[in-house]
Amino acid sequence: ILVTTENEIETGKGLLGLWDSQLNYRRIGQIASGGIGPHEVKALPNEMGIVVANGGIRTHPKYGRKKLNLEMMRSNISFFDLNYSLKNKLKLPKEMQLNSIRHLDVSAQGKVAFGTQWQGDQSEIVPLVGYIDQMQTLTLIELNILNQSELKGYIGSVAINGGGSLISATSPRGGISHIYNNNTLVQKFWKTDICGVASVNN
């Protein structure tokens, strides 16, 4: 089954489209994504289901890229089983309400790495990268002000290695990539407009 992230334009409701690859990718249904603005979906290992990053931001074609609900937005990460039933929904702390969860990656053991994009005052320095372990505990990676500010409030992509110990996050706005070993920043490098990142040879 191919799963696509979609939006119901008039209501703002997030949707997941379901398409059967054995039927020439015919659409066979849709389900609620668990939030507003689903941005990325990944399969969980061992046929455990799927995980979705709901960014929380409502838009409408009539208004272009204008963000319509920042005063009440709340992003989340939603977990679904193989029957596409919602099993769990995790949110960032209340003070992180304006942090839009956009990108995901999943390790071979089911640890979920995620990256966010800060929608609040850009002078505020907030965590932008985190992970959810196999017990479904959410952790934000805390950095010092210098390292955090390099990311310019914007994560463009994340990747996690097979073992789940290493997470890479990129910021095209900052032109920088960070690599974390669990909660510790261990490496960084700079490249203009750096963005897409993937794990290779897990």
Task: Please name every model-derived segment.
Residues 30-34, 91-97, 142-152, 187-192:
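Surface loop/turn motifs at the tips and blade-to-blade linkers of beta-strand repeat domains
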Residues 1, 35-43, 97-104, 150-159, ...:
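Repeated scaffold domains used in trafficking and secretory/extracellular systems
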Residues 2, 50-51, 113, 166-168, ...:
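Conserved beta-propeller blade signature
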Residues 13-23, 67-84, 126-136:
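Beta-propeller blade signature
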Residues 46-48, 109-111, 163-165:
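Short coil/turn segments that connect the beta-strands within blades of beta-propeller domains
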Residues 147-182, 188-198:
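Loop/turn-rich, solvent-exposed surfaces of beta-rich toroidal or solenoidal domains
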Residues 1-45, 53, 58-60:
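Asp-box/WD-like beta-propeller blade repeats and closely related beta-sheet repeat scaffolds
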Residues 3-13, 52-73, 115-126:
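Short, conserved, GDST-rich strand-edge loop motifs in beta-rich repeat architectures
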